[in-house]
Amino acid sequence: MKRGHDYSSSDSELDENIEVEKESADENGNLSSMSPSTSSQILARKRRRGIIEKRRRDRINNSLSELRRLVPSAFEKQGSAKLEKAEILQMTVDHLKMLHTAGGKGYFDAHALAMDYRSLGFRECLAEVARYLSIIEGMETADPLRVRLVSHLNNYASQREAASTAHTSIGHIPWGGTFAHHPHLSHPLLLAQTAHTNSTSSSTEAHHHNRLRGSPHAESSSLRVAPNGNIASVLPVVASSKLSPPLLSSMASLSAFPFSFGSFHLLSPNSLSPTTPTPSGKPYRPWGTEIGAF
C-alpha cells in the first residue's frame, strides 16, 4: 500500500532533516574516504551549529531572567521557589493583560512602577522581621510584642499602598512621610535639636562647641566638634566598658565621614550607660517599650 504524503512538516524542516541525514551518512560511511579539507569543513560546520545553538539558549535564558525581574508577581515569588519557564511566561501574559485592562496605566508611570517595587521590598523586609523575631529572639507567634510590631508594619504597608494609588490626585508622598511626624516614635537615646539657619550658623556652632567643652563628660562620652562646626573624622575617646559593642561599631562608622552638625540628632551624654541584662536572662531590647505606642 502506498503511504500518503505527510504535509505536517514545513519545507525548511524537511530540508534541514535531509541535510542532517546527508551529513550523518557522510560522517559514518565515507569519513575515511574524505579528503582532509572536506572533513575539516564538516567539523567546522558542526562546531558553528553548536555555538549558534548555545547563543540561542543564552538569549532565551537572559530574556526569561529579565521577565522574572520585571514582572512583579514573578519577582515576588523568585525568592521562595524556582520558577519554571512556562510559569514566567504565564505571569508575563497575565501582567500584560492586567495592564491592557487598566487602560495602559503603568507603561510610562515611573513613580507607580517604583512604588510597586518598594511595596514588594517592604513586604519582604516585614517577612524577615517576623522570621528574626521567631528564630533569633525566640518569640512565639502569639507574643504580644511580636503581634503589635507585625500588625503595625502591616498597617503601614497598607497605608503606603493606598497612598500610592491616589498619587495622581494628591501628588508624591515621600516614603518616610508617615514616620516623620509620628508623636510616639521619639527614642530616649535621641535628643531634639532645633534647626539651624544660615543667618545664625556661627553663633549656634559656638554654642554647641562651648556646651560640649563645658560638659564633664565631653572628652569621654560625646563627639568632638571641629572649628568649622562639623563633626570631624575623629573617633571619640570612650571607655569600652561604658559602651556596648554595637554602639561602639556605629560610633566608629560615624567617625569615618564628616557630617554637618545640624543635620542629625546627637546622643545624650548620660544615655551612654551600660546596658543591664534583665533578671529573666533575655537580651535587653530598648525598642520593646516603644512598640506599645504603635
From Swiss-Prot:
BP-aspect Gene Ontology terms = circulatory system development; floor plate development; glomus development; negative regulation of DNA-templated transcription; negative regulation of transcription by RNA polymerase II; Notch signaling pathway; pronephros development; proximal/distal pattern formation involved in pronephric nephron development
One GO molecular function term? bHLH transcription factor binding
> Which residue intervals make up region (Disordered)?
1-48, 195-225
Q: Where is there biased composition of kind Polar residues?
A: 27-42, 195-204
For this record, the Gene Ontology CC terms, alphabetical, are: nucleus
Q: In which tissues is it expressed?
A: Expression in late gastrula and early neurula embryos is restricted to dorsal endodermal cells and the medial neural plate and in dorsal endodermal cells. Expression fills exactly the gap in between the two rows of motor neurons in the ventral neural tube. At later stages, expressed in the floor plate, in hypochord cells and in the somitogenic and anterior presomitic mesoderm. By tailbud stage, also highly expressed in the dorsal hindbrain, telencephalon and eye vesicles, olfactory placodes, branchial arches, tail fin and somites.
Pfam name, any one: Hairy_orange
Per the entry, induction is: By Notch signaling.
User: What superkingdom heads the lineage?
Assistant: Eukaryota
Q: Which UniProt keywords apply?
A: Developmental protein, DNA-binding, Notch signaling pathway, Nucleus, Repressor, Transcription, Transcription regulation
Q: Which residues form the Orange domain?
A: 117-153
Q: Where is this motif: YRPW motif?
A: 284-287
Q: Which family does it belong to?
A: Belongs to the HEY family.
Q: Any domain commentary?
A: The Orange domain, downstream sequence and the bHLH are required for efficient heterodimerization with hes/hairy proteins, and for transcriptional repressor activity.
Q: What is this protein called?
A: Hairy/enhancer-of-split related with YRPW motif protein 1
Q: Which organism is this entry from?
A: Xenopus laevis (African clawed frog)
